[in-house]
């Protein structure tokens, strides 16, 4: 049994192996990991949501040690067994049934690709961003800034206030942002500009995406910017008019260098086209790695890292995580550290 395997590991001085044995269990996947990922998939950040393709894909990635820094770029999707209603672009029935039938995700999830299952062209696929659940929550209506803001919140552990920097160039702020809200330009110069100057050039990567509420499906219009990018374009006509899905990371300058952008390898370009390359930029930052560790620490230890010892442990876990981006290992390391607490 799992318990006897854990006991043997602990008695032989191998607590990390004991933690891995504990994860070799349906509850780790169906309960712990489902609840871990669920809040990232909706605007309310609620854990009380049905299983969906975003959650299942996170669970599968962790199970299979898929490097987690590909979270926003990998052409990947996890589905349940063939006995379920087939995966649909138009509803969540496949995953609702997977959950209703209590199928063990440790053995029942199968890896496939989004392009094969959804018909999205391969260059449109951007990891969990292009799952149906993420599109329904964050590409619906609006201006597609939500997908970016909730990624910052859920995966870089920073909301827009924390990355506010009024000193950056404002040349890619869209036309819908009034330069004198309520007739007062000081409000823009001291407040609005500090988020939009960094967010708008990055969120340009999402220019071809929309979630169609009538059909219940994600849309990708290659080469054609979604109309939502021109909402309220008369607010400030000299503002930036989105022409394609190019993006630029202005946060590589100024105070937001502290997010620790990659200087070489994946995610080090600083600019590009499309969501997947922008996803690599975010997921290879120090902020992404430390955020995953912080979330795992809290999920396992039931508290944030709070004292010097906790913070030192978190730093060790970040270094270990960046060596292979294996989330399961991060869970195991947190479990060993908080064992008996």
Give the residues covered by each predicted segment.
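Short cysteine/histidine-rich zinc-coordinating motifs and their immediately flanking basic loops
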Residues: 204-209
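Active-site-surrounding "flap" and adjacent substrate/cofactor-binding loops of secreted or lumenal enzymes
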Residues: 2-22
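Extended surface/linker regions that mediate inter-domain or inter-protein docking
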Residues: 17-202, 283, 287, 297-300, ...
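Alpha-helix boundary/interfacial micro-motifs
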Residues: 171, 213-215, 341
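Electron-transfer interface patches adjacent to heme c in soluble/periplasmic c-type cytochromes
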Residues: 20-21, 134-144, 178-179, 185-187, ...
